[in-house]
Curated annotation (Swiss-Prot):
Residues 46-59 are mitochondrial matrix. Keywords: Copper, Electron transport, Magnesium, Membrane, Metal-binding, Mitochondrion, Mitochondrion inner membrane, Respiratory chain, Translocase, Transmembrane, Transmembrane helix, Transport. CDD domains: CcO_II_C. Component of the cytochrome c oxidase, the last enzyme in the mitochondrial electron transport chain which drives oxidative phosphorylation. The respiratory chain contains 3 multisubunit complexes succinate dehydrogenase (complex II, CII), ubiquinol-cytochrome c oxidoreductase (cytochrome b-c1 complex, complex III, CIII) and cytochrome c oxidase (complex IV, CIV), that cooperate to transfer electrons derived from NADH and succinate to molecular oxygen, creating an electrochemical gradient over the inner membrane that drives transmembrane transport and the ATP synthase. Gene3D superfamilies: 1.10.287.90, Cupredoxins - blue copper proteins. One of its GO terms (biological process) is ATP synthesis coupled electron transport. It is found in: Mitochondrion inner membrane. Belongs to the cytochrome c oxidase subunit 2 family. The chain crosses the membrane at residues 15-45, 60-87. This is Cytochrome c oxidase subunit 2. Mg(2+) binds at E198.
Length: 229
């Protein structure tokens, strides 16, 4: 999860987030090199006296400053398109969960189970126990098995919402009357925090998302206990 004074991204907990981190570093390096080159050219132009005010045509220079930006954009666009297609793929999910946004809480339905559904509300600050995080904890976490492809169906009951968990590299809009689909694989056990990322009313800041990734045996025990409750 995020820490005070953190400048970088949260630690990746899914293959997609790993790809996004690599793409961020790749793009940042390209932007840094371009900025350095442009700053160097501007500095040279402002300081040198070797200028030709009568120069009207320079096809070689024009060709260079046309081809180089095109190559740079292609180098940035190709990895981006690859990740875009990877994020759109849903290959043989082991578990399907439907997340429904409400004002101002989330509800979850595990479609692989007949009667496994629950609401997830933020725990008020006065009810937090030592070690819990303010404005991020919920009474019912969305539990998923780690290292298992999970499909997430996202919609909303009333207004626009957005289901987002940065560590998993997932952000999907929840729109009333529409069903959006995404997928993720939690590569390690842990608790991953997110929040609604679409302004949805007065209590928009108070509808957090908590995903808990556990081993498959623990998930089966949890689902059995939820069905018996």
């Amino acid at each position: 999860m995020a820490h005070p004074s953190q400048l970088g991204f949260q630690d990746a907990a899914s293959p997609i987030m790993e790809e996004l981190l690599h793409f961020h570093d790749h793009t940042l390096m390209a932007v840094f090199l371009i900025s350095t080159l442009v700053l160097y050219i501007i500095t040279i132009m402002m300081t040198t006296k070797l200028t030709n005010t009568n120069l009207m045509d320079a096809q070689e220079i024009e060709m260079v400053w046309t081809i180089m930006p095109a190559i740079s954009l292609i180098m940035i666009a190709l990895p981006s398109l690859r990740i875009l297609y990877l994020m759109d793929e849903v290959n043989d999910p082991h578990l399907t969960i439907k997340a429904i946004g409400h004002q101002w809480y989330w509800s979850y339905e595990y479609t692989n189970y007949e009667d496994l559904s629950f609401d997830s509300y933020m725990i008020p600050t006065n009810d937090l126990t030592p070690g819990q995080f303010r404005l991020l904890e919920v009474d019912n976490r969305m539990v998923v098995p780690m290292e298992s492809p999970t499909r997430l169906l996202v919609t909303a009951e009333d207004v626009l919402h957005s289901w987002a968990v940065p560590s998993l590299g997932v952000k999907t809009d929840a729109i009333p009357g529409r069903l959006h689909q995404t997928s993720f694989i939690a590569t390690r056990p842990g608790v991953f925090y997110g929040q609604c990322s679409e302004i949805c009313g007065a209590n928009h800041s108070f509808m957090p998302i908590v995903v808990e990734a556990v081993p498959l045996t623990d998930f089966e025990n949890w689902s059995s206990s939820m069905l018996e409750a």
